[in-house]
C-alpha cells in the first residue's frame, strides 16, 4: 500500500535500481595433490522493500523495524584465496576471505525502545505488547574478513564398514567503519567435527559442534556465551520400485545445552531448541 499502514511507511516516490555483479576465479595446480584457488568479485544488491519502508513491529523478530527510503544500492568488493589438497583418501582446504562494503545494509539497534501494538480486527481495541527494541535499516561502510578450513579423511574401510572423519571451522571479523564498532550479529569462532560410518545400506554419524563466546559486538548489544553440542544419527536406505528411501533417527543437542546464536536477533528471548529426537522417512524420485 503506497499510503502506508501500521507496518510500512508511506511511499510517495518510486525507487528503481540496476544492480550488476562481476566475478572471476582461477585455480593453479601446484602438483598432483596441492592447488591454489583465488576469486575476485564485485557485487551490487538493491535494497528490499522492507529495508526501504519498514515502520512497525516485526512479530517474528520481536523488534520494531524502521526502514530508510533513501537507501542506495549495497556495493561490495570481495576476494578469497584458498590452499587445497586431495590425495584421494584425504582432502581439504584452508582459506582467507575479505570483503569491503561501500554501503552495507544492516539492521542496527538504535538503543531505543518503541511501543509495539497488535490489532485483532477491532480498531477500538489495541492490545499493547509493551516496549520492544528499535532497529534501523542503515547503509554503512563495512569490512568483513576471516579464515575458514575444512578437511575430510577416509580413516579406513574393511568388512566392518567405511569410517571417515570430517573437520571444519571458520572465524569472521566484521567492523562498521562509520562507527569503529563491530557489526552486530556476527557468528563467533566455530569448530565442527563428525565421525561417519557406512556399511552397505546402513549409515551413521556423530557430530560435535563448538562455538566460542562472542564478545565483539556494538556497545548497545548483548554478548553470547560459548557452547558445545552433540548430535547423532543412524539411517537405512532401501528401494521401493524405482524410488529410493531413507529411514532415519536423528538426535540434536543431545546434552541439552543452552544455545544462543550470536547471529540471531532473538537470542536474548528465544534460545535454540534443546534436546530433540526426530524419526523420519525420506524418498527421492
Give the location of each predicted region.
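Outer-membrane beta-barrel signature, preferentially recognizing the C-terminal barrel domain
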Residues: 10-25, 29, 33, 42-93, ...
Amino acid at each position: 500500500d503506497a499510503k502506508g499502514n501500521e507496518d510500512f511507511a508511506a511511499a510517495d516516490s518510486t525507487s528503481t535500481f540496476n544492480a550488476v555483479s562481476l566475478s572471476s576465479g582461477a585455480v593453479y595446480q601446484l602438483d598432483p595433490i596441492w592447488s591454489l584457488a583465488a576469486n575476485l568479485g564485485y557485487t551490487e544488491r538493491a535494497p528490499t522493500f522492507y529495508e526501504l519502508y519498514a515502520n512497525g513491529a516485526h512479530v517474528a523478530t520481536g523488534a520494531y523495524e524502521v526502514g530508510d527510503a533513501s537507501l542506495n544500492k549495497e556495493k561490495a568488493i570481495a576476494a578469497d584465496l584458498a590452499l587445497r589438497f586431495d590425495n584421494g583418501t584425504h582432502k581439504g582446504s584452508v582459506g582467507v576471505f575479505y570483503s569491503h562494503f561501500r554501503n552495507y545494509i544492516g539492521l542496527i539497534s538504535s538503543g531505543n525502545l518503541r511501543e509495539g501494538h497488535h490489532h485483532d480486527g477491532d480498531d477500538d481495541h489495541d492490545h499493547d505488547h509493551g516496549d520492544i527494541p528499535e532497529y534501523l535499516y542503515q547503509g554503512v561502510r563495512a569490512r568483513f574478513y576471516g579464515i575458514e578450513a575444512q578437511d575430510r579423511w577416509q580413516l579406513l574401510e574393511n568388512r566392518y564398514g567405511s569410517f571417515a572423519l570430517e573437520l571444519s571451522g571458520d572465524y569472521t571479523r566484521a567492523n562498521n567503519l562509520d562507527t569503529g564498532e563491530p557489526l552486530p550479529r556476527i557468528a563467533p569462532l566455530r569448530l565442527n567435527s563428525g565421525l561417519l560410518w557406512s556399511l552397505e545400506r546402513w549409515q551413521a554419524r556423530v557430530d560435535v559442534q563448538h562455538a566460542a563466546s562472542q564478545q565483539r559486538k556494538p556497545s548497545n548489544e548483548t554478548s553470547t556465551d560459548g557452547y558445545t553440542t552433540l548430535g547423532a544419527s543412524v539411517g537405512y536406505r532401501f528401494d521401493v520400485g524405482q524410488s529410493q528411501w531413507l529411514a532415519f533417527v536423528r538426535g540434536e543437542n543431545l546434552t541439552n545445552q543452552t544455545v544462543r546464536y550470536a547471529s540471531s536477533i532473538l537470542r536474548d528471548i528465544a534460545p535454540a531448541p534443546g534436546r530433540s529426537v526426530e524419526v523420519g522417512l525420506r524418498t527421492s524420485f
